[in-house]
Amino acid sequence: MASSSSKASDSSSQRPKRPDQGPSGKDAAGLVVLHGKLAQLKRQVQSTRLAAIKERVEANRKALQVHTCALFDVAAAAEVASRGAEGGNALSRGAAEGHCRLVGWDSASGPGERELVHVQEENLVAGTLVLSSSGGSGASHRTVVQLAKLPVVDKIPPYTTWIFLDKNQRMADDQLVCRRRIYYDPIVNEALICSESDDDVPEPEEEKHVFTEGEDQLIWKATQDHGLSREVLNVLCQFVDATPSEIEERSEVLFEKYEKQSQSSYETDFQLFLGKTMDVALDSFDNLFCRRCLVFDCRLHGCSQNLVFPSEKQPYGHGLDENKRPCGDQRYLRRREVYQDTCNDDRNACTTYNTDSRSSSLKVSATILSESEDSNRDEDNIKSTSIVETSRSKITNSEYADKSVTPPPGDASETENVSPDMPLRTLGRRKISKHASKSNDHSPDKRQKIYSSPFPFAMSVLNKQSVPEIGETCPDSIESAVDQLPSLDDPNKKISTKDMCAGSTTNTTENTLRDNNNNLFISNKEHSISHWSALERDLYLKGIEIFGKNSCLIARNLLSGLKTCMEVASYMYNNGAAMAKRPLSGKSILGDFAEAEQGYMEQDLVARTRICRRKGRARKLKYTWKSAGHPTVRKRIGDGKQWYTQYNPCGCQQMCGKDCACVENGTCCEKYCGCSKSCKNRFRGCHCAKSQCRSRQCPCFAASRECDPDVCRNCWVSCGDGSLGEPLARGDGYQCGNMKLLLKQQQRILLGKSDVAGWGAFIKNPVNRNDYLGEYTGELISHREADKRGKIYDRANSSFLFDLNEQYVLDAYRKGDKLKFANHSSNPNCYAKVMLVAGDHRVGIYAKDRIEASEELFYDYRYGPDQAPAWARRPEGSKKDEASVSHHRAHKVAR
């Protein structure tokens, strides 16, 4: 066995040969050898199995012996305790000493002479019972028994076991309900109801062979040594009770099983997980997560939904107070604060220095506004200008470059482990000059000439468009930067702090530093990207999309345990080549990743530009109640004469056309669609003032919809103290009254015996007119399935089906809430209404009049003339029911 297993493991990397891949013919001697090997292996498997069975039987025998001994000890102790107890057996004593003797006779008479005849005389008025008996001697005995009168209790009505649902659920595809269900007719004869068609009954499948562990060993041994030819399959059929096709399928399963086990064991699941992209890692989550209910494994919309990506993304929130506080020692804001304190102390000494050489002097005038609260360094509205004057050229054109936060320079090791003493550079916007001479037009690269500072501290980590602000440069930092400067043309040549503050450097030094900066920039970029896995890069891009360039929030929420805030900031401003408006020359290094990040950043900049523009001036929109949706659709729904249409999100981009799924179905586009907010088919909510959302003036209420806080302007929900950025609660305590179903603000419903029929629903607290009572929940089934179930429910004299829309019917027979017990009445105190809540149709129960506490709830089921049960029909002479809508089955219909 050991040799065979080792040989099997060695050959596990080779796939077994297929019948057409094997040799053309097998030698008879080879088949004989294979037959002998399989027979020997079978005997070994049988002997091993026999030994295992004997061992298990012995273990079970010992365990049973211990268990029986324990039970015997318990029984013996109980017997001893019963013998020593006083009074004997209480049951025997109670039987011997009865409360009354029903029959009496002479105990002295012999047993053969007793012939008892019982006579009962009932006196219901007195509540007594006289029992008389006569023996063989002719003596009679009478015994009077006092009867106890029990109170009359009504029979408990039939009750159906049901499962509580707080929201609707869709019926499973493979669910079988009301098939072959037994019911009892009035003659109490058992009958059987099958489905409408016998084709629905699945045919019994053939039993498949279940392979044992020993059979797997035989198949694996034969396929690894001799392949999977037809001769080998025929030989295996002699040892395994299965067909050749089943053996072939089993060999494929065994190959996949052993192939996975033969993979490298040193790679952990975490390492394999990091090697994947985010799309591959979240593939199962995309199928299980519902983007409408924001839950996994949604019972309402199901799994494997069509992914609809919105064309307009929500702007990320910013301006939180907590972003000002450093999240830890690895937060780059803490390094920046330490660096700014150091610069403030040394800046006074730098300003007292006089520059005498005007031919090469640099006059710097910088005006820096306060930084934004979200620590977003390249999108703050910071205006910083630098006027550079030189004796050789004159500035003729300028443009602004983005502001960036740059970590300290260093080699590859310093990029990963940043010293706490090394501050980050804060660079402002500045003007860069462009030569207007002819020689520049004939330059090889034909680009703008950028006046870069010869400071290796900043230039070693910035791209060609990032120039440090000279006014922010401190002598100490420059001195340390010069010490860390790599070797130039002249290794003994040093640049003094005085010359660097004055800006008196030669062109040779500038060119050398510029070339050195480019080399360091490319090397640092290559190193940093190589240390970021594919999953980490995807998470970083997703963080840019959600939080902007806020390294703290990205590291805390998406890269927790993987990267620190400092590493995210370093990666953002070292390798974020897409943040520059112009492409870099080293595009081949970043590849598609730079293009993807550039797409994120461009979209982010456009969104932030719109936000900043809105802050400057309030935009007044032309909005009327007619623009909220389609008046024809709203009128049709309000009249209740046609079916409601099931909503399915469309995947249109930007504007919807004639091919839009929502337009074809006659529904409005909702917030779950992929089209933009400016789509003409989009429902834009309401702009109602206070206390107007419960009137027909509200577009949402008129269209039988509930207000949506994400769509309606003045209908928003506040829960909390505002610490998470949500809007504070209004001072007057106003809240939109058309969001009861969305917020589940239902009343307390009680369940009790009804005076009308069966069980009923009762209100606990008094309610006013049009108040929301609760939701009628249940299973979402098709109309065809509802017809099948309705036949059973009609025989049981119950109705739990509720027409929802043209695609689904609510069935609350097995799953629902307590409002399913509300009975029908021709004069109801409640009414049912179908409302569209977040794209889903839901049934709400509302008070028709004022209802007092503990009062039973009734609403009109809207039965057809011949569909209502006997207890729900109107008295003769009433013709109001004739106007009701006729249905094929007893269904509840909302108005």
UniProtKB/Swiss-Prot annotation:
Reaction equation(s) it catalyzes: L-lysyl(27)-[histone H3] + 3 S-adenosyl-L-methionine = N(6),N(6),N(6)-trimethyl-L-lysyl(27)-[histone H3] + 3 S-adenosyl-L-homocysteine + 3 H(+)
Amino acid composition bias (Basic residues), ranges on this chain: 886-895
Positions of region (Disordered): 1-28, 369-425, 485-508, 867-895
EC number: 2.1.1.356
Similarity annotation: Belongs to the class V-like SAM-binding methyltransferase superfamily. Histone-lysine methyltransferase family. EZ subfamily.
Subunit description: Component of the polycomb repressive complex 2 (PRC2), which methylates 'Lys-27' residues of histone H3 (H3K27me3), leading to transcriptional repression of the affected target gene.
Protein name: Histone-lysine N-methyltransferase EZ1
The organism of origin for this protein: Oryza sativa subsp. indica
